[in-house]
Amino acid sequence: MTERLVIIGGCAAGMSAASKARRTDPDLDILVYEKTGFVAYGACGMPYYVSGLVQDHNTLVVRTPEQFARQEIKVHLHHEVTGIDAARCRVRVSDLESGETREEACDKLVIATGGRSAIPAGAPGFSPGELQGVFTLRALEDGIAIREFIQREKPRRAVIVGAGYIGLEMAESFRVLGLETTVIGRPPQMLKRFDPEMAQFMQGALEDEGVRLSLGDEAKALEGDSQGRVRQVVSSSGAFEADLVLLALSVLPNVALAEAAGVALGETGAIATDAGMRTNLPNVFAAGDCAEAYHRVIGRGAYIPLGTTANKQGRVMGTNAGGGQATFKGIVGTTITKAFDTYAALTGLAEKEARALGYEVKSTTIKARSRAHYYPGSAPMHVRLVVQEGSGRLLGGQIIGDEGAGLRINVLAGALHSDMTVEQLSQLDLAYMPPMSPVWDPLLVAANVALKG
């Protein structure tokens, strides 16, 4: 008898799981329920669609429901799963267009419900739909709505509430479009995973491009005019005029559905899984922004929601849901973002994070050049290494600079994945040519300075 796999959520983890499950078991009956109008799209490309760098939102879509149908993967758009009966392995599904509700049986269940934007409870003006011109950016439909609003209403002043990756990238998008842009962040720095000494370089890059930063500040209320259009953001430091507000606060795991069904959560509040992406319930899997990921540096689950992790976890989950055998080897927390010509990359632990976890550490920060000093385009690059005292074990790294930051952070990610010491890092045989690096790569310079320290 043919088994049925039901997948809740059609973005990175869900559709990676669907595709891999199909390749693992050609006979599996696969149903995907997605409450929005799109599946399998590059969510990280949305800021560039808003700015106009990417002209057509359809180019962000990797595969359409029709393409999945050719693999015999049935995708149901605008369908929301509102309940899970794990004991009977059934889900309650609501058709958001017709209003009809039905039950669907399954043999195995994948939960890929993703993350949700953190919205301050009870704060005036923050509730969805309360004021025109207030947006979040999680789904592709959000990006489309923001771009259409800008084209239709031609706002002059944008305020971004939140100073993380989305806030930073959207600040660039709004400035590219000519909007006066303010970023309000509750922490005293942008990019809170970074050490303050490194975050300041990115903050300077934004201010150089005309972005106003109000850090160590908290948005308290959004106020509108008589027609219900947002007009200002009231914060603990004052008021900021706004025609457009983007709420880019923390991403939280979307786990209410899973938790109600008895799925266990980890210490982070996201779904806990084993290395095969199995939950505590039989035949129920979870992956992506709703789930924890094993962090190789700290040796336990962490919540660092990223598309790269979601795709890898989804692939493992799909293999196992399809009857195969696969394990997720873990993350080291590698991220990168960009604003204008400055890139900020991080892997592993920042010094402040390592100390909070009880590690005794020393940090080394150096300034080098991204290319040979005489080669056109050579630019400053700041590298920070975090090393465990005594053992010399590499715990993390941060790089601020030009596009070369991305290439180098991947070297550090590999070093962390392999549990290398800073001495071993210093001995790596890295490529050299003047257009790409100095003869002493900034990573090697930083490692050698750390060894002296």
State each model region's role.
Residues D27-D29, E72-E97, E104, V176-A275:
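A Rossmann-like FAD-binding core segment of flavoenzymes
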